[in-house]
């Protein structure tokens, strides 16, 4: 049996920058888009779930406040950028991320909608 060695991003269990809680391919895609001139291109991303949990028959729209807070506070620390550099992200992309702040629009169902 082959074992897989999983290296944590940061060994500090108390470090919790949500910007770094993502699939790594999202960073590689963003770096590629940046390098190919798409830095200022408007793009759309969706936050959704595929099915109701526990075979439930309905869903309630909730959590928009937390999502807005996440988007407004989205940033990368020096620690994050140093790590991303070790994973091959370009210097230009890392410079961009160092000052990145979300400035998009958010469309959502009204909180509490069934």
Where are these regions (language model features)?
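Ordered alpha/beta subdomains of enzyme catalytic regions
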Residues: 1-114
């Amino acid at each position: 049996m082959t074992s897989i060695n999983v290296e944590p991003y940061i060994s500090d269990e108390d470090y919790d920058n949500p910007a770094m809680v993502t699939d790594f391919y999202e960073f590689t895609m963003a770096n590629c888009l940046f390098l190919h001139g798409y830095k200022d291109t408007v793009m759309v991303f969706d936050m959704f779930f595929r099915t109701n949990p526990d075979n439930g028959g309905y869903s309630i729209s909730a959590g928009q406040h937390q999502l807005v807070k996440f988007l407004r506070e989205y940033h990368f620390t020096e620690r994050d950028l140093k790590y991303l550099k070790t994973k091959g992200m370009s210097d230009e992309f890392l410079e961009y991320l160092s000052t990145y702040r979300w400035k998009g629009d958010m469309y959502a169902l009204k909180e509490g909608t069934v």
